[in-house]
């Protein structure tokens, strides 16, 4: 992961595994502790990235103990940093919990409709966002107004 720190590429971090290798996925408290101990350098890089990049949490929960600790440490040690974002279906996180996430972890919640029940609306929204970002990049490159 370190080689990507100086890269202009976007990075998808699958901190606790991927469905492509389910045997390496992390679910239990013991597995979290073991991973934190055996991958200490990863968590140091994660600490740095939290301070220098904007994170969008997508397809995960809000109760990951390692991520909670990392975000809370950064929030209280370095006040005034720009927020990170957590994307979830409407109604899955209460208004009070959203306030707690912002106050303690500097996370703003972005909600989307999930009428279908299979999150297809999220995919549509992400595709639309991608098109808008591409258009804006072209506009900025042509006008040099950044």
What are these regions (language model features)?
Residues 1-9, 20-23, 43-146:
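SIR2/sirtuin-family catalytic core signature
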Residues 9-32:
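Active-site-proximal helix-loop elements at catalytic-domain edges
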Residues 27, 31-44:
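Active-site glycine-rich loop that binds ribose-phosphate moieties when present
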């Amino acid at each position: 992961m370190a080689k990507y720190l100086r890269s202009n590429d976007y990075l998808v971090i699958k901190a606790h595994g991927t469905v492509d290798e389910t045997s390496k996925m992390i679910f239990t408290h013991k597995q979290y502790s073991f991973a934190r101990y055996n991958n200490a350098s990863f968590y140091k890089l994660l600490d740095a990235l939290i301070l220098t990049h904007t994170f969008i949490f997508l397809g995960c929960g809000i109760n990951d103990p390692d991520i909670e600790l990392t975000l809370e440490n950064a929030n209280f040690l370095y006040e005034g940093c720009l927020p990170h974002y957590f994307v979830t279906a409407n109604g899955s996180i209460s208004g009070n919990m959203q306030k707690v996430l912002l106050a303690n972890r500097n996370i703003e919640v972005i909600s989307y409709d999930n009428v279908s029940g299979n999150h297809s609306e999220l995919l549509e929204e992400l595709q639309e966002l991608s098109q808008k970002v591409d258009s804006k990049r072209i506009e900025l490159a042509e006008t040099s107004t950044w």
